[in-house]
Amino acid sequence: MNVLPCSINTLKGLYDISGVEVGQHFYWQIGGFQVHAQVLITSWVVIAILLGSATIAVRNPQTIPTDGQNFFEYVLEFIRDLSKTQIGEEYGPWVPFIGTMFLFIFVSNWSGALLPRKIIQLPHGELAAPTNDINTTVALALPTSMAYFYAGFTKKGLSYFGKYIQPTPILLPINILEDFTKPLSLSFRLFGNILADELVVVVLVSLVPSVVPIPVMFLGLFTSGIQALIFATLAAAYIGESMEGHH
């Protein structure tokens, strides 16, 4: 008796899944370049949130911290401890860089789950986390690579490049390849995890739009935070390694 309605509902769910857009982008033409508009829009929202939060945090500091000031001080202390653990005693100049990377990635990852996707109607695609676009993750990984090259070169000068022939010159190609694979691993790890998380949530919402996707969304928020921590930890570890020597 209920076979037909169930079949119709199943087909409707499959149809909704087939409508999930993967790799669809809304482009802006800027000069001779095409840029992903939805990535820029969400990135601007993330930057506005971070700048607004930072402004509020330093606007009226109290000797006895309020709840909000306590929170921001805890975040700063967490980033400082992370940088010191991975870089060592010379961590100070790198705290702003590591903190910026961590906070931008953290808020970007969460924006994909917390910002309503349909809040702004786009001709193509939907609003999503900036970090589910490979262009964003590569743009985050490349400054990290330049940072650890800069850290090693400023600390050791030309002798920094001696690490490529340690412990034996035979390993020169492998040591060079290792440095080139670091930004690749950083960018593809972050991109793959965030994209997969958002696709899983979209598919589950299409199939069972009520209760089932909620635990997956909470799991996605947790893993999004972990991915930001992993990226920042590895960035700090690479900088610390370049300053200490090849291991």
Swiss-Prot record:
What the entry lists under InterPro entries is as follows: ATP_syn_F0_a_bact/chloroplast, ATP_synth_F0_asu, ATP_synth_F0_asu_AS, F0_ATP_A_sf
**Functional description taken from the UniProt entry:** Key component of the proton channel; it plays a direct role in the translocation of protons across the membrane.
| A GO molecular function held by the record | proton-transporting ATP synthase activity, rotational mechanism
Q: Which family does it belong to?
A: Belongs to the ATPase A chain family.
Q: Enumerate the PANTHER family for this protein.
A: ATP SYNTHASE SUBUNIT A, CHLOROPLASTIC
Per the record, the major location class is: plastid
* Transmembrane intervals: 38-58, 95-115, 134-154, 199-219, 220-240
Quick check: keyword Transport in the entry? Answer: yes
Complex and partners:
F-type ATPases have 2 components, CF(1) - the catalytic core - and CF(0) - the membrane proton channel. CF(1) has five subunits: alpha(3), beta(3), gamma(1), delta(1), epsilon(1). CF(0) has four main subunits: a, b, b' and c.
Write the record's keywords in alphabetical order, separated by commas. Answer: ATP synthesis, CF(0), Chloroplast, Hydrogen ion transport, Ion transport, Membrane, Plastid, Thylakoid, Transmembrane, Transmembrane helix, Transport
Q: Mind telling me what this protein is named?
A: ATP synthase subunit a, chloroplastic
CDD domains found in the cross-reference section: ATP-synt_Fo_a_6
Places the protein is found? Plastid, Chloroplast thylakoid membrane
Task: Note the topology in the membrane.
Answer: Multi-pass membrane protein
Q: Which Pfam families match?
A: ATP-synt_A
Enumerate the SUPFAM superfamilies for this protein. Answer: F1F0 ATP synthase subunit A
An example of a Gene Ontology cellular component annotation for this protein is:
chloroplast thylakoid membrane
